[in-house]
Design a protein with these regions (language model features):
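N-terminal leader/targeting signatures
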Residues: 1, 9, 13, 30, ...
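Intrinsic-disorder-associated, low-complexity terminal segments enriched in Asp/Asn/His/Tyr and depleted
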Residues: 2, 11-12, 21, 36, ...
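Serine residues within intrinsically disordered or low-complexity segments
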Residues: 3, 8, 13, 17, ...
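Short, positively charged and aromatic/hydrophobic N-terminal segments
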Residues: 58, 65-72, 78-90
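Ligand-binding pockets and gating/stacking loops
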Residues: 72, 85-575
Length: 575
């Protein structure tokens, strides 16, 4: 057996309490174990909740100061002058407000602020443009490195069933394999699910990694899966203790999107990382792993909200000035805030707000630049092309992602938008978490909603000459339990699949990836990797490799270097 991980020594971590997850540090019988990143094979120390980021550039603006300034300006000068997206930390394309309470600057813990989405102009502005890059790294000399100028990560929220989509096992016992049949694809020797007919014709562009798993380091629940797959860092002991009650911490490791935002030169007008069509989770149930965390909120992605009811509405009025606000009046407000900033700097005897002023300038540029607003305007696309993508929220999110790639945005994340109707039908929370009615929900809803938009995205990028410089990643926080029958939804009769973090699949295309190949295999029932097992850290390193980011050094407050990701290696065989 060819393993990417040497067997680890037994550690002292408590066994997990969730399904689909061997105890941390131990492989299932006969399975390769993942290596712990901490010395001696022990799990990393628990992350400690704190009230501010541990790591940042020494010149990073202090959030508390900037929050005070802008909340003060909103209360005392002209509340209407600050557009909603500046005030609330995310663009809400549905027109719903996310009120900014003045108690924020009086001492609400930053963890609560993160859960609420950063209710301040700082979160709305500083999260827009990834700040000043610490220096884009030169393209590595390894094969395929640096080809990708942009990346689109499509995240199938809830835990997509690998055994029903990318890794079917027609020879497995009936209680494992389910009713779906594999079909031939445009890549010889590769089969996909029969309910992905359009994507099957794009298989010559796909690399399918079938041997991805958490190696016993996760918890079997969503929050840990999000964190591991979005950051490349294994969940610490706080995830094992709190499970899905583990909310984002300021000293978490940053998302892949935020690392790209840090390492790539800032876009002159647009954010360096954008997330569509939502931030994952409710304020009290926010998924960890989406944020810049210890890098500082200036490297957060911009979260752009969309809706199933109005899938084209990634456009004004949310990106426009309010009707009663002219450009001139906005300029006056901007100058007023500049005076407040200058007074604060003089009072402190420092220039710690210098970077924030640059974020403000870019925010003003986005509001007043027609080119910036144009990138979000899907009405500029022809109706036939919109129909090719599918006119639902997934199709329009992927079409917008392509437009943002054309506009030069380095990293776009597209989460699956929850469908309330699916929640009752599949016991899934509205997504891919198919605890019940797994096969009907996949066949009638989830797979068709992915098949058309994803296949069209790959075609569209290729037709425009963009696929070779755009990496497309399709992933999820976990797979589904291969043995059918979820005890929470009627057992075998419920036809659901429970959580399964020991094995899942990820699709890669573009950005130098050689299509028409499969990396790794699973056992006869798709329960565990059988050959070349890898973890999310390897996928993260592969993304960085494709984007030419070979220097993963960042700096703490004392300007001391630290590595953003030490574990894992890029899967260079895929290039």
């Amino acid at each position: 057996m060819n393993s990417a991980f040497p067997a680890s020594a037994a550690d002292n971590s408590p066994p997990a309490s969730r399904v689909g997850h061997p105890a941390p540090g131990h492989a299932a019988p006969g399975r390769p174990a993942f290596r712990h990143s901490a010395p001696g094979g022990h799990a990393p120390a628990p992350a400690r909740p704190v009230t501010g980021p541990l790591f940042s550039r020494s010149t990073r603006p202090r959030p508390a100061d900037t929050i005070r300034q802008l909340c003060f300006a909103r209360r005392h000068f002209d509340k209407a002058a600050i557009p909603g997206w500046m005030a609330h930390g995310s663009i809400d394309m549905t027109g719903q407000s996310r009120g900014c309470g003045s108690p924020l600057h009086g001492g609400i813990p930053r963890r609560t602020w993160l859960q609420a989405g950063g209710c301040s102009a700082l979160a709305g502005l500083a999260g827009l443009w990834g700040g000043l890059a610490q220096g884009a790294t030169p393209a590595a000399s390894k094969a395929g490195a640096g080809r990708a100028k942009s990346a689109i990560m499509i995240f199938l929220s809830g835990g997509a069933s690998h055994i029903d989509t990318w890794d079917l096992k027609p020879q497995a016992p009936l209680e494992y394999r389910g009713p779906f049949q594999p079909i031939h694809t445009s890549a010889p020797g590769i089969e996909l699910c029969e309910h992905l007919p359009l994507l099957s014709q794009q298989a010559h562009r796909l690399a399918i990694v079938r041997s991805l798993g958490d190696g016993g380091r996760g918890t079997g629940d969503h929050h840990a899966g999000y964190y591991y797959n979005l950051t490349g860092h294994a969940p610490d002991q706080t995830f094992h203790r709190l499970l899905n009650a583990r909310t984002p911490y300021p000293d978490d490791w940053p998302s892949i999107a935020s690392v790209v935002s840090l390492k790539r030169p800032p876009h002159p007008q647009l954010p360096s990382a954008i997330t569509l069509p939502q931030k994952e989770g409710a304020p009290e149930y926010t998924r960890p792993g989406q944020f810049a965390a210890r890098l500082g909120i200036e490297f957060d992605p911009l979260f752009v909200d969309g809706s199933r009811e109005k899938p084209l509405a990634f456009a004004p009025p949310a990106l426009a000035l309010q009707s009663e606000i002219s450009v001139g009046r906005m300029q006056n407000r901007r100058e007023l805030l500049a005076l407040v900033d200058a007074a604060q700097r003089r009072a402190e005897g420092s220039d710690s707000l210098g970077n924030y002023g640059k974020h403000q300038s870019k925010a003003f540029s986005l509001l007043t630049s027609q080119a910036s607003k144009s990138a979000f305007d899907l009405q500029q696309e022809s109706e036939p092309l919109r129909e090719r993508y599918g006119t639902g929220i997934m199709g329009m999110s992927l079409l917008l992602a392509r437009r943002l790639v054309e506009a030069g945005v380095p990293f776009i994340t597209v989460f699956y938008k929850a469908n309330k109707e699916l929640d009752s039908l599949c016991k899934s929370g509205g997504g891919w978490d198919t605890h019940g009615n797994n096969f009907n929900c996949l066949k009638d809803r989830l797979l068709p909603e992915l098949d058309r938009p994803l296949s069209t995205l790959l075609e569209d990028l290729a037709e425009r000459g963009l696929l070779d410089e755009t990496m497309v990643i399709v992933t999820s926080e976990m797979g589904r339990k291969p043995k059918i029958g979820d005890p929470r939804s009627g057992g075998v009769n419920g036809a659901g699949r429970d959580h399964w973090t020991a094995c899942q699949s990820v699709l890669l295309a573009g950005g130098g990836i050689r299509g028409g190949q499969v990396y790794g295999t699973t056992d006869r029932n798709a329960e565990y990797p059988a050959d070349r097992p890898v973890g999310p850290e390897h996928i993260a390193q592969t993304i960085y490799h494709a984007m030419g980011i070979d220097d993963l050094t960042a700096y703490d407050r004392q300007n001391r270097p630290f590595s953003l990701l030490e574990s894992g290696q890029p899967l260079t065989e895929l290039f």
